[in-house]
Amino acid sequence: MSISIKRKIGQLIISGFRGKTLGECSDVLNFITEYNIGGVILFDEDLEIGTPGTRNIESPDQLKDLTDKLQNISENSLFIAIDQEGGKVTRLKQMYGFKNTPSWQHIGYLNNTLITKEHSDSIALVLSNCGINLNFAPVLDIS
């Protein structure tokens, strides 16, 4: 079966969207089913509104439900992305029921490979448990 150019191009796209449930996300449903997008990126704050908790993230259970449903409507496995760097750049905040995530700068100052690995593993576990498989966290961040 041949895949149309439109659907091939769709695989190159990762789209943000508004809504915490699929019922609120008609645009992204169309992007996934009609255009075969490669993934989505999740945010907690809608910058136009400027208030935390107004975009895609409300709680760990809500987030897992959303990511499961997004995967279930897609023909292919979606990249489900987030910016969960820790410190100032964190989407999974304590106010939503997640643990505080220290910044990588703080972890670097500790200069302890065991703590660094534990921190990495902790972030990976939280993301995995929420159905998130792509973290746009910095590999190298110079301040």
Region annotations inferred by a language model:
Residues 22-23, 83:
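Short gly/ser/thr-rich secondary-structure transition/capping motifs
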Residues 36-143:
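Enzymes and membrane/adaptor proteins characterized by extended Gly/Ser/Thr/Asp/Glu-rich
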Residues 7, 29-42:
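N-terminal glycine-rich anion-binding loops that anchor highly charged ligand groups
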Residues 1-22:
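Boundary/entry segment of secreted carbohydrate-active catalytic domains
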